[in-house]
């Protein structure tokens, strides 16, 4: 609905013409109530299943090397959730405390971050050399490692779990030895825009 400032104050504030003019001249204010923001949910990892059969079957079906799966599972960075049997990719802080979890359905296309996850800590591995490989999804990281297995633990990898650049920027700040960044994002609109933000 169009109109001038007086019309807006009359409509929005329920004022008469004279009252609206007073408001605009600074002689009266409109008290706006602040909308309550819901408090952020605490971050809780989904409960672990007693085994990882479905996650192994899913990832092996994606041609991920068994040793790569075992490597991340052994370090508590990958597990199967007890309720939905999703693959859960865990991102930890420098002290080994989980701060982020990304779920990938083992049946169907479900993907999502656990409520309360901090994007800066998404699924990653920090190696000793100076190269950081940046991906959109954790499965992309595992696929790349499977295709390029030579001395892979020496490199660093991060899955943005979307295209927010926060995780890559956090790693570069926390680990100054990382000097070379290789963007391995999808060639779609989201990947191209995410890559532009990282440049």
What residue ranges belong to the model's regions?
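Non-catalytic accessory segments of DNA primases and related replication-initiation nucleases
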Residues: 1-61
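Phosphate- and divalent-cation-binding pockets in alpha/beta enzyme and binding domains
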Residues: 8, 143-144, 193-197
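Secondary-structure boundary elements
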Residues: 61-68, 92-97
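Short, basic/aromatic recognition patches
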Residues: 65-82
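Phosphate-handling DNA/RNA-contact segment within nucleic-acid enzymes
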Residues: 79-174
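Acidic beta-strand-to-loop metal/phosphate-binding motif
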Residues: 134, 178-190
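Acidic, metal-coordinating catalytic cores used for nucleic-acid/nucleotide bond scission
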Residues: 162-166, 185-195
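Short, aromatic/basic amphipathic alpha-helical patches
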Residues: 171-174, 193-199
